[in-house]
């Protein structure tokens, strides 16, 4: 067979494979991270627990250290239109932030974890990270391509792509294996941002990638170092405008607003030690 014919045949074969929705091999960057099936199981389990939610269906995404999307899942018992479609890309955005702005045990001063929830106050005008939310934008040329019937399956068109994005409300967490070694991030979206955080936490715990016992954080709870912080209070002496148009202040600098049916983050599982 001539080289040109071989290339043509290979291209046709690849096209047929993609069109049929067959599961392609996991990207090399995803080695050591959970499969789509494992993510799906963890998501279904997490959604069934008490998360202070509105009862909406969810999306979840795992992203590798280099930003490669490794797995995307949605509620396994429903149709595509049974959850917010926009939350698919938001879950990727959260996972990408969770890997891009978390540090593993190889960091100069060791591991340090910030959930997306920890960034809400810090990125407001006057906050220490103001402007971060505008960096590393989602790539629209990648985010919305492909067969929508495959969204949330093992053949989701986003798998293997680098989508980018930074999100600054609850639902994104770093993934850490034993010893505080960071493997990537997980992002969850589909309900209130407070519920998204709760479900992401339970997903990470089920996947056994919550080895943060020696990892630094800002929550003030060493057993949950990157937990959501509800410390925004009303003040007339400066601070940020909240949705009610009143001025609020986060003493920690990393607080997150409360949500409808607000959950109790202190009930979340403790992280594991190395």
Regions found by a protein language model. Name each.
Residues 9-19:
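Bacterial N-terminal signal peptides
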Residues 1-10:
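Bacterial N-terminal signal peptides that target proteins for export
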Residues 20-22, 26:
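N-terminal signal peptide c-region/cleavage motif recognized by signal peptidases
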Residues 26-274:
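Flexible, solvent-exposed loop/hinge segments and secondary-structure transition points
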